[in-house]
């Protein structure tokens, strides 16, 4: 059925599971939630190569943060393998490549460093809006590099390349 569950059951457990999985995968690919204009046409938000470098990360934070970045670098106060084993069946993206030690070499265009123990709902809204914040900042041009602080985040920009055109697949 259209709803993903039994006919007429838009909010069946199967539909909720599928919807949750699809939203997380959309965010992994595009770096943001689905956005639309007043005519319901899609708004494509710039996709940056963003790495989160998170001190004091735990498994709950990893689950919340992982879809919102290209790579997440965590301290090993817990075993990320449990999260990877549980989440990997829900995505084609290799999570063992996305989740790295905080001591690993960073190779993202943009690094966002923060203490996970200080994350609040307001801070998480900054994460959700980060691509739009970066693209709307008049000071960020194609060749802008540098760093700034925003809320609990230290943001380092090494490259402002965007990747949304590379994410569109059109095979004939």
Indicate where each model-derived feature is located.
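ANL superfamily adenylate-forming
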Residues: 134-144
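Short, well-ordered secondary-structure micro-motifs within conserved domains or adaptor modules
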Residues: 93-133, 153
């Amino acid at each position: 059925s259209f709803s993903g569950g039994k006919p007429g059951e838009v909010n069946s457990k199967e539909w909720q599971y599928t919807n949750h999985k699809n939203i997380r995968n959309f965010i992994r690919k595009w770096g943001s939630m689905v956005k639309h204009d007043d005519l319901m046409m899609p708004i494509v938000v710039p996709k940056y190569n963003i790495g989160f470098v998170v001190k004091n990360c735990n498994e709950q934070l990893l689950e919340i943060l992982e879809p919102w970045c290209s790579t997440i670098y965590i301290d090993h106060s817990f075993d990320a393998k449990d999260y990877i084993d549980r989440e990997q069946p829900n995505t084609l993206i290799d999570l063992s490549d996305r989740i790295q030690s905080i001591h690993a070499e960073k190779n993202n265009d943009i690094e966002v460093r923060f203490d996970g123990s200080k994350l609040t709902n307001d801070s998480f809204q900054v994460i959700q809006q980060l691509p739009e914040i970066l693209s709307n900042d008049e000071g960020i041009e194609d060749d802008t590099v540098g760093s700034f602080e925003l809320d609990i985040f230290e943001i380092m920009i090494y490259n402002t390349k965007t990747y949304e055109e590379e994410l569109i697949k059109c095979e004939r």
